[in-house]
C-alpha cells in the first residue's frame, strides 16, 4: 500500500514538474491525481485504525484483571528524525485512549508505568539492572544465566512492576 502511495505521489510530482517546464498537463488531471492520493491516505489510515481496534478487542477478550502499559515519551521520539515517521504511523495516543475506554467499559484496571522504569534493562529472574544495554542488543543476557528476547523480558518486568499509576 505504501509503495502504491509513493508511486502516485511521484506521478503527481511529475505533473507539477511538467507544468513548471512549460508542458501541457491539465489541471483536471492534477485534481484527479490528488484525489487518488487522498483516497490512499484514507485507506492506509483506516487499515491502521482497524488494526488498533482488533488488537484492543483481542486483548480485552482474554479478560485480564489488569493491563500494564508504559508511559512513552512520544513527543521526544518524534524529535528523532529516524524514528518520527514510524512513531507517527503507529498512533500511540489513539491506541492508549481506546484501550483506556475499553478497560473502563469492561472493568479492567489499566496500569501505567513511568517512562523511566528500567523495564528493558532489568533481569526478570534476579532483578539485576544492566546499565550498558544498547537498543541494538535484541537478546537480554544476564550474568545469572538468564537469556531472553529483550521485549519479552521488558513485558515480564512491566507485568510485575510495583510502581505504577492507575488510569
Segments (PLM) and residue ranges:
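Positively charged, helix-rich recognition surfaces that bind polyanionic ligands
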Residues: 1-167
